[in-house]
Amino acid sequence: MASDWRRQSTSRGIPNEGQNDEKGKPLIGRSFLLEIENRILRTNVAEGLHISGATIIDSFDDASPQCVISDHPMAQKLEKAKKDDPLFKNEKMLKIMPALLRQAVNRNIKVRTPERFLNQMNTWLDRQGKTTSATTSNSTIRGKPSFGRENSAKIERTTPRLVPRMPRVSSDQTSSRPKEERCFLRIDVPGKRPEIRNVSKESFSIVYSGRDTGFSIFKAAESSLVERRQREYDSFLKGKYEPSKKTFKFDERDNYCQFCQKTILGDRKDHERTDEHRNKARTQGITQTMERIVLNARLRAERQEAALKRNQRKSRESVMFVEKSKRANVEYEYGENEIKANWLMLKANTVEKTTEKTSILSPRRRQKRMRSLSSQGDI
Protein backbone atom coordinates (compact mmCIF):
# COMPACT_ATOMS: atom_id res chain seq x y z
CA MET A 1 0.00 0.00 0.00
CA ALA A 2 2.79 2.39 0.83
CA SER A 3 4.46 1.74 -2.50
CA ASP A 4 1.16 2.28 -4.31
CA TRP A 5 0.65 5.55 -2.44
CA ARG A 6 4.10 6.74 -3.37
CA ARG A 7 3.53 5.78 -7.01
CA GLN A 8 0.17 7.58 -7.03
CA SER A 9 1.60 10.66 -5.37
CA THR A 10 4.43 10.88 -7.88
CA SER A 11 2.02 10.40 -10.76
CA ARG A 12 -0.18 13.19 -9.38
CA GLY A 13 2.83 15.51 -8.98
CA ILE A 14 3.09 15.34 -5.19
CA PRO A 15 6.79 15.01 -4.21
CA ASN A 16 7.66 12.24 -1.80
CA GLU A 17 10.52 12.07 0.71
CA GLY A 18 12.94 10.26 -1.63
CA GLN A 19 12.56 12.90 -4.31
CA ASN A 20 13.13 15.70 -1.82
CA ASP A 21 16.39 14.11 -0.66
CA GLU A 22 17.63 13.70 -4.22
CA LYS A 23 16.73 17.28 -5.15
CA GLY A 24 18.16 18.75 -1.96
CA LYS A 25 21.40 16.79 -2.26
CA PRO A 26 22.53 16.72 -5.91
CA LEU A 27 26.04 15.35 -5.20
CA ILE A 28 24.99 12.08 -3.59
CA GLY A 29 27.37 9.26 -4.47
CA ARG A 30 30.15 11.60 -5.62
CA SER A 31 33.48 12.02 -3.84
CA PHE A 32 35.77 15.04 -3.66
CA LEU A 33 39.38 15.45 -2.59
CA LEU A 34 40.35 18.62 -0.70
CA GLU A 35 43.84 20.17 -0.69
CA ILE A 36 43.15 23.49 1.04
CA GLU A 37 45.58 25.03 3.53
CA ASN A 38 43.27 27.84 4.63
CA ARG A 39 41.12 26.51 7.46
CA ILE A 40 38.21 28.88 6.87
CA LEU A 41 37.95 27.97 3.20
CA ARG A 42 38.31 24.28 4.01
CA THR A 43 35.47 24.36 6.54
CA ASN A 44 33.22 26.30 4.14
CA VAL A 45 33.86 23.87 1.30
CA ALA A 46 33.41 20.85 3.58
CA GLU A 47 30.06 22.20 4.84
CA GLY A 48 28.90 22.81 1.27
CA LEU A 49 29.84 19.27 0.25
CA HIS A 50 28.15 17.80 3.33
CA ILE A 51 24.93 19.72 2.62
CA SER A 52 24.92 18.62 -1.02
CA GLY A 53 25.43 14.97 -0.02
CA ALA A 54 28.99 14.44 -1.29
CA THR A 55 31.75 12.50 0.45
CA ILE A 56 35.27 13.76 1.17
CA ILE A 57 38.23 11.43 0.65
CA ASP A 58 41.84 11.86 1.76
CA SER A 59 43.77 10.24 -1.11
CA PHE A 60 43.44 8.60 -4.49
CA ASP A 61 43.78 5.12 -2.96
CA ASP A 62 40.20 5.11 -1.68
CA ALA A 63 38.49 5.96 -4.97
CA SER A 64 38.85 8.22 -7.96
CA PRO A 65 37.24 11.53 -6.95
CA GLN A 66 34.90 13.57 -9.09
CA CYS A 67 36.98 16.72 -8.58
CA VAL A 68 40.05 17.98 -6.70
CA ILE A 69 39.56 21.29 -4.87
CA SER A 70 42.87 23.07 -4.16
CA ASP A 71 43.97 26.59 -3.24
CA HIS A 72 47.42 26.12 -4.79
CA PRO A 73 48.42 28.83 -7.36
CA MET A 74 48.70 26.15 -10.05
CA ALA A 75 45.04 25.23 -9.52
CA GLN A 76 43.93 28.49 -11.15
CA LYS A 77 45.91 27.68 -14.31
CA LEU A 78 44.62 24.11 -14.42
CA GLU A 79 41.08 25.35 -13.88
CA LYS A 80 41.23 27.71 -16.88
CA ALA A 81 43.21 25.35 -19.13
CA LYS A 82 41.54 23.16 -21.75
CA LYS A 83 42.02 19.43 -22.29
CA ASP A 84 44.41 19.83 -25.22
CA ASP A 85 46.49 22.47 -23.44
CA PRO A 86 50.27 21.72 -23.55
CA LEU A 87 50.38 22.60 -19.85
CA PHE A 88 49.28 19.05 -19.03
CA LYS A 89 52.18 17.58 -21.02
CA ASN A 90 54.95 19.90 -19.83
CA GLU A 91 57.31 17.99 -17.55
CA LYS A 92 58.69 21.11 -15.87
CA MET A 93 55.22 22.25 -14.86
CA LEU A 94 54.33 18.78 -13.62
CA LYS A 95 57.42 18.76 -11.38
CA ILE A 96 56.42 22.11 -9.88
CA MET A 97 52.89 20.89 -9.05
CA PRO A 98 52.16 19.17 -5.73
CA ALA A 99 51.61 15.42 -5.74
CA LEU A 100 47.79 15.52 -5.60
CA LEU A 101 47.50 17.95 -8.51
CA ARG A 102 50.01 15.93 -10.53
CA GLN A 103 47.97 12.75 -10.01
CA ALA A 104 44.77 14.62 -10.92
CA VAL A 105 46.35 15.79 -14.19
CA ASN A 106 47.59 12.30 -15.02
CA ARG A 107 44.15 10.78 -14.31
CA ASN A 108 42.24 13.54 -16.19
CA ILE A 109 40.35 14.66 -13.07
CA LYS A 110 38.90 18.15 -12.83
CA VAL A 111 40.66 20.74 -10.66
CA ARG A 112 38.74 23.62 -9.08
CA THR A 113 39.59 26.45 -6.72
CA PRO A 114 37.58 26.88 -3.49
CA GLU A 115 36.25 30.27 -4.60
CA ARG A 116 34.81 28.96 -7.85
CA PHE A 117 33.34 25.87 -6.17
CA LEU A 118 31.58 28.00 -3.53
CA ASN A 119 30.26 30.36 -6.22
CA GLN A 120 28.84 27.42 -8.16
CA MET A 121 27.19 26.06 -5.01
CA ASN A 122 25.64 29.45 -4.20
CA THR A 123 24.25 29.85 -7.71
CA TRP A 124 22.77 26.36 -7.56
CA LEU A 125 21.11 27.08 -4.19
CA ASP A 126 19.69 30.35 -5.53
CA ARG A 127 18.17 28.54 -8.49
CA GLN A 128 16.70 25.90 -6.21
CA GLY A 129 15.10 28.59 -4.08
CA LYS A 130 13.56 30.33 -7.09
CA THR A 131 12.22 27.21 -8.83
CA THR A 132 9.13 25.73 -7.11
CA SER A 133 6.73 22.99 -8.00
CA ALA A 134 3.50 23.81 -9.77
CA THR A 135 1.50 21.87 -7.17
CA THR A 136 3.10 23.28 -4.04
CA SER A 137 3.49 26.91 -5.15
CA ASN A 138 0.82 29.50 -4.50
CA SER A 139 -1.43 30.71 -7.27
CA THR A 140 0.07 33.33 -9.54
CA ILE A 141 -3.38 34.72 -10.42
CA ARG A 142 -4.14 37.67 -8.18
CA GLY A 143 -7.42 39.43 -7.89
CA LYS A 144 -8.17 43.11 -7.78
CA PRO A 145 -6.74 45.00 -4.82
CA SER A 146 -9.21 45.68 -2.05
CA PHE A 147 -8.27 48.79 -0.09
CA GLY A 148 -10.56 47.81 2.77
CA ARG A 149 -8.30 45.03 3.95
CA GLU A 150 -6.50 45.39 7.22
CA ASN A 151 -3.22 43.87 6.04
CA SER A 152 -1.20 46.77 4.68
CA ALA A 153 1.54 44.53 3.26
CA LYS A 154 -0.84 42.95 0.74
CA ILE A 155 -2.20 46.37 -0.22
CA GLU A 156 1.29 47.68 -0.94
CA ARG A 157 2.15 44.55 -2.89
CA THR A 158 -0.94 44.55 -5.09
CA THR A 159 -1.38 48.30 -5.68
CA PRO A 160 0.36 49.42 -8.86
CA ARG A 161 2.98 52.12 -8.53
CA LEU A 162 1.91 55.26 -10.32
CA VAL A 163 4.76 56.95 -12.15
CA PRO A 164 4.23 60.69 -12.80
CA ARG A 165 4.03 61.58 -16.44
CA MET A 166 6.87 63.62 -17.81
CA PRO A 167 5.85 66.63 -19.91
CA ARG A 168 6.65 66.36 -23.57
CA VAL A 169 9.68 68.19 -24.86
CA SER A 170 8.69 71.22 -26.88
CA SER A 171 10.49 72.26 -30.03
CA ASP A 172 11.84 75.41 -28.40
CA GLN A 173 13.29 73.64 -25.37
CA THR A 174 16.10 71.13 -25.70
CA SER A 175 15.04 69.31 -22.53
CA SER A 176 12.11 69.59 -20.17
CA ARG A 177 14.24 68.86 -17.10
CA PRO A 178 16.15 71.84 -15.74
CA LYS A 179 19.89 71.26 -15.94
CA GLU A 180 21.72 71.10 -12.64
CA GLU A 181 24.17 73.95 -12.36
CA ARG A 182 27.69 72.80 -11.61
CA CYS A 183 29.55 74.81 -9.01
CA PHE A 184 33.27 75.29 -9.32
CA LEU A 185 36.11 77.24 -7.75
CA ARG A 186 38.74 79.01 -9.81
CA ILE A 187 42.12 79.45 -8.15
CA ASP A 188 44.32 82.01 -9.94
CA VAL A 189 48.02 81.58 -9.21
CA PRO A 190 50.39 84.25 -10.64
CA GLY A 191 52.55 82.84 -13.41
CA LYS A 192 50.58 79.59 -13.72
CA ARG A 193 47.43 78.27 -15.31
CA PRO A 194 44.23 78.85 -13.31
CA GLU A 195 43.13 75.77 -11.43
CA ILE A 196 39.41 74.92 -11.59
CA ARG A 197 37.89 72.52 -9.07
CA ASN A 198 34.31 71.28 -9.26
CA VAL A 199 32.47 71.33 -5.94
CA SER A 200 29.15 69.65 -5.21
CA LYS A 201 26.36 71.75 -3.74
CA GLU A 202 25.82 69.30 -0.93
CA SER A 203 29.21 70.07 0.61
CA PHE A 204 28.36 73.70 1.39
CA SER A 205 25.48 76.15 1.46
CA ILE A 206 27.14 79.58 1.25
CA VAL A 207 30.51 80.65 -0.17
CA TYR A 208 32.02 83.74 1.45
CA SER A 209 34.40 86.15 -0.26
CA GLY A 210 36.16 89.40 0.55
CA ARG A 211 36.21 90.68 4.11
CA ASP A 212 33.44 88.33 5.20
CA THR A 213 35.62 85.28 4.48
CA GLY A 214 37.07 83.53 7.46
CA PHE A 215 40.02 81.18 7.34
CA SER A 216 37.95 79.12 4.85
CA ILE A 217 35.66 80.32 2.04
CA PHE A 218 32.86 78.17 3.49
CA LYS A 219 33.02 79.86 6.91
CA ALA A 220 32.12 83.43 7.79
CA ALA A 221 34.67 85.62 9.52
CA GLU A 222 34.18 86.59 13.14
CA SER A 223 33.61 90.19 14.15
CA SER A 224 37.09 90.50 15.70
CA LEU A 225 38.71 89.30 12.46
CA VAL A 226 36.67 91.76 10.38
CA GLU A 227 37.64 94.66 12.70
CA ARG A 228 41.32 93.74 12.56
CA ARG A 229 41.26 93.59 8.76
CA GLN A 230 39.55 96.98 8.63
CA ARG A 231 42.19 98.46 10.97
CA GLU A 232 45.03 97.04 8.89
CA TYR A 233 43.46 98.37 5.69
CA ASP A 234 43.04 101.88 7.16
CA SER A 235 46.64 101.94 8.37
CA PHE A 236 47.77 100.73 4.93
CA LEU A 237 45.98 103.64 3.27
CA LYS A 238 47.68 106.07 5.68
CA GLY A 239 51.07 104.45 5.07
CA LYS A 240 51.49 103.27 8.64
CA TYR A 241 50.89 99.57 8.12
CA GLU A 242 53.56 97.27 9.50
CA PRO A 243 53.10 93.52 9.04
CA SER A 244 53.11 91.63 12.30
CA LYS A 245 56.36 89.82 12.93
CA LYS A 246 55.87 86.20 13.72
CA THR A 247 57.71 84.94 16.73
CA PHE A 248 59.85 81.95 15.93
CA LYS A 249 62.65 80.10 17.61
CA PHE A 250 66.04 79.74 16.00
CA ASP A 251 67.08 76.21 15.27
CA GLU A 252 69.59 74.86 17.71
CA ARG A 253 73.05 74.17 16.38
CA ASP A 254 73.75 70.57 15.59
CA ASN A 255 76.84 69.76 17.64
CA TYR A 256 76.72 65.99 17.13
CA CYS A 257 78.99 64.27 14.58
CA GLN A 258 77.47 61.12 13.09
CA PHE A 259 80.82 59.80 11.86
CA CYS A 260 82.69 60.20 15.13
CA GLN A 261 79.51 59.57 17.21
CA LYS A 262 80.24 62.26 19.76
CA THR A 263 79.33 65.87 20.49
CA ILE A 264 81.55 68.54 18.97
CA LEU A 265 83.28 70.97 21.29
CA GLY A 266 83.88 74.24 19.46
CA ASP A 267 83.42 75.02 15.80
CA ARG A 268 82.15 72.29 13.48
CA LYS A 269 84.53 73.24 10.65
CA ASP A 270 87.56 72.84 12.92
CA HIS A 271 86.34 69.38 13.89
CA GLU A 272 85.85 68.37 10.23
CA ARG A 273 89.48 69.35 9.48
CA THR A 274 90.86 66.95 12.08
CA ASP A 275 92.52 63.68 11.03
CA GLU A 276 90.20 61.60 13.21
CA HIS A 277 87.08 62.87 11.45
CA ARG A 278 88.61 62.52 7.97
CA ASN A 279 89.77 58.95 8.59
CA LYS A 280 86.36 57.87 9.89
CA ALA A 281 84.54 59.59 7.03
CA ARG A 282 86.91 57.94 4.54
CA THR A 283 86.52 54.46 6.06
CA GLN A 284 82.71 54.71 6.01
CA GLY A 285 82.81 55.20 2.28
CA ILE A 286 81.35 58.67 1.89
CA THR A 287 84.60 60.22 0.67
CA GLN A 288 85.12 57.54 -1.97
CA THR A 289 81.55 57.93 -3.16
CA MET A 290 81.91 61.70 -3.43
CA GLU A 291 85.25 61.38 -5.20
CA ARG A 292 83.77 58.87 -7.62
CA ILE A 293 80.84 61.19 -8.36
CA VAL A 294 83.16 64.17 -8.94
CA LEU A 295 85.54 62.10 -11.07
CA ASN A 296 82.70 60.75 -13.20
CA ALA A 297 81.36 64.26 -13.72
CA ARG A 298 84.82 65.50 -14.66
CA LEU A 299 85.41 62.64 -17.10
CA ARG A 300 81.99 63.18 -18.63
CA ALA A 301 82.75 66.88 -19.15
CA GLU A 302 86.14 66.06 -20.72
CA ARG A 303 84.56 63.52 -23.06
CA GLN A 304 81.93 66.01 -24.14
CA GLU A 305 84.58 68.68 -24.75
CA ALA A 306 86.75 66.27 -26.80
CA ALA A 307 83.73 65.18 -28.85
CA LEU A 308 82.86 68.82 -29.51
CA LYS A 309 86.41 69.59 -30.69
CA ARG A 310 86.41 66.50 -32.89
CA ASN A 311 83.15 67.51 -34.53
CA GLN A 312 84.41 71.06 -35.10
CA ARG A 313 87.63 69.76 -36.68
CA LYS A 314 85.68 67.44 -38.96
CA SER A 315 83.41 70.26 -40.05
CA ARG A 316 86.42 72.51 -40.82
CA GLU A 317 88.15 69.75 -42.78
CA SER A 318 85.01 69.06 -44.77
CA VAL A 319 84.69 72.77 -45.66
CA MET A 320 88.37 72.94 -46.70
CA PHE A 321 88.02 69.79 -48.79
CA VAL A 322 85.03 71.26 -50.61
CA GLU A 323 86.94 74.49 -51.33
CA LYS A 324 90.00 72.57 -52.59
CA SER A 325 87.88 70.41 -54.85
CA LYS A 326 86.21 73.49 -56.33
CA ARG A 327 89.61 75.14 -56.92
CA ALA A 328 91.02 71.97 -58.53
CA ASN A 329 88.06 71.79 -60.89
CA VAL A 330 88.57 75.42 -61.90
CA GLU A 331 92.31 74.91 -62.49
CA TYR A 332 91.66 71.77 -64.49
CA GLU A 333 89.17 73.54 -66.70
CA TYR A 334 91.52 76.54 -67.14
CA GLY A 335 94.41 74.23 -68.11
CA GLU A 336 92.34 72.42 -70.71
CA ASN A 337 91.23 75.71 -72.25
CA GLU A 338 94.82 76.97 -72.39
CA ILE A 339 96.05 73.78 -74.14
CA LYS A 340 93.27 74.09 -76.70
CA ALA A 341 94.19 77.73 -77.40
CA ASN A 342 97.91 76.91 -77.88
CA TRP A 343 97.05 74.03 -80.18
CA LEU A 344 94.92 76.30 -82.35
CA MET A 345 97.72 78.88 -82.53
CA LEU A 346 100.28 76.24 -83.61
CA LYS A 347 97.89 74.85 -86.16
CA ALA A 348 97.45 78.25 -87.81
CA ASN A 349 101.31 78.79 -87.82
CA THR A 350 100.96 82.09 -86.01
CA VAL A 351 103.83 83.62 -84.07
CA GLU A 352 103.25 85.93 -81.17
CA LYS A 353 104.52 89.42 -81.90
CA THR A 354 106.43 91.27 -79.23
CA THR A 355 107.09 95.03 -79.06
CA GLU A 356 110.68 94.71 -77.77
CA LYS A 357 113.38 93.58 -80.23
CA THR A 358 115.44 90.80 -78.81
CA SER A 359 118.40 88.96 -80.23
CA ILE A 360 117.95 85.46 -81.50
CA LEU A 361 121.56 84.49 -80.67
CA SER A 362 122.58 83.31 -77.26
CA PRO A 363 125.01 85.42 -75.17
CA ARG A 364 127.97 83.10 -75.81
CA ARG A 365 127.51 83.19 -79.60
CA ARG A 366 127.09 86.93 -79.46
CA GLN A 367 130.50 87.31 -77.72
CA LYS A 368 132.25 85.07 -80.29
CA ARG A 369 130.83 87.18 -83.12
CA MET A 370 131.94 90.40 -81.50
CA ARG A 371 135.52 89.07 -81.15
CA SER A 372 135.69 87.99 -84.74
CA LEU A 373 134.52 91.40 -85.99
CA SER A 374 137.07 93.29 -83.85
CA SER A 375 139.96 91.15 -85.14
CA GLN A 376 139.03 91.86 -88.79
CA GLY A 377 139.09 95.63 -88.21
CA ASP A 378 142.64 95.57 -86.87
CA ILE A 379 144.00 93.89 -90.00
From Swiss-Prot:
Regions of compositional bias (Polar residues) in chain numbering: 128-141
Region annotation Disordered: where it falls in the sequence: 1-25, 128-158, 355-379
Organism superkingdom: Eukaryota
Record protein name field: Uncharacterized protein F55H2.7
Lineage of the organism: Eukaryota, Metazoa, Ecdysozoa, Nematoda, Chromadorea
